[in-house]
C-alpha cells in the first residue's frame, strides 16, 4: 500500500512494485 498508489491515480511504478511483491507467493 503506497500513498502515491492510493485511489485511481496509480503510478506505473507503484503498480509494478505491488505486482513484484505479490509475485513471490
UniProtKB/Swiss-Prot annotation:
Cited InterPro entries: CA_dom (IPR001148)
Chain intervals for the UniProt region annotation (Disordered): 1-25
Cofactor section: Zn(2+)
Domain Alpha-carbonic anhydrase: 1-25
Top-level taxon of the source organism: Bacteria
Industrial or biotech use: Has a potential use in the concrete technology for the development of an inherent and more durable concrete material.
Family the UniProt entry places it in: Belongs to the alpha-carbonic anhydrase family.
Task performed by this protein: Releases silica from silica-rich substances.
The protein's name: Bioremediase
Species for this entry: Thermoanaerobacter sp
The organism's taxonomic lineage, starting at the top: Bacteria, Bacillati, Bacillota, Clostridia, Thermoanaerobacterales
Amino acid at each position: 500500500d503506497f500513498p502515491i498508489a492510493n485511489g485511481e491515480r496509480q503510478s506505473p511504478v507503484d503498480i509494478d512494485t505491488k505486482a513484484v511483491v505479490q509475485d513471490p507467493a
